[in-house]
């Protein structure tokens, strides 16, 4: 049986994952409207992935006979200065989500909630992967530059990542 504390934290995490999905959808739209179709595709796909993260949490809560408490999702940022800023914000956002997951893991350990701890290990691994991914993209964008041809090359690099993640 899940403790009230874990239930509260998991419900909050569902909403954080939904917010993540909206943020990446907003970033994707900005990229598409600035002819950065590669980054747009990557972020669009990533928005769907974040939505799947929320669904996975919902299923876990439902399996434990816990009602999910969805809250209003605030409007995500939609004005950006450029590709570097988008991926910097995305990287920082992933770090924030990792902190949130780690906090729930800590509570599960303290409460000796082995089932929740085990369930969350997938998220711990996923967050590590996402932080590495976004940091790598950010590093490549900064290396290539985002002026003139560099912006095009950076967009193509991100497009390649998006396509490779689909296969």
Curated annotation (Swiss-Prot):
It is an enzyme of class 1 (oxidoreductase). Its EC number is 1.16.3.2. One of its GO terms (cellular component) is cytosol. Fe cation 2 binds at residues 50, 94, 127. Keywords: Cytoplasm, Iron, Iron storage, Metal-binding, Oxidoreductase. It catalyses: 4 Fe(2+) + O2 + 6 H2O = 4 iron(III) oxide-hydroxide + 12 H(+). GO terms for biological process: intracellular iron ion homeostasis; iron ion transport. Residues 1-145 form the Ferritin-like diiron domain. It is found in: Cytoplasm. The keyword Metal-binding applies. GO terms for molecular function: ferric iron binding; ferrous iron binding; ferroxidase activity. Fe cation 1 binds at residues 17, 50, 53. It comes from the Bacteria. Gene3D superfamilies: 1.20.1260.10. Its main location: cytoplasm. Homooligomer of 24 subunits that assemble into a spherical protein shell (12 +/- 1 nM diameter) that can sequester at least 2000 iron atoms. Iron-storage protein. Was originally thought to be an adhesin. Belongs to the ferritin family. Prokaryotic subfamily. This is Bacterial non-heme ferritin. It comes from Helicobacter pylori (strain ATCC 700392 / 26695).
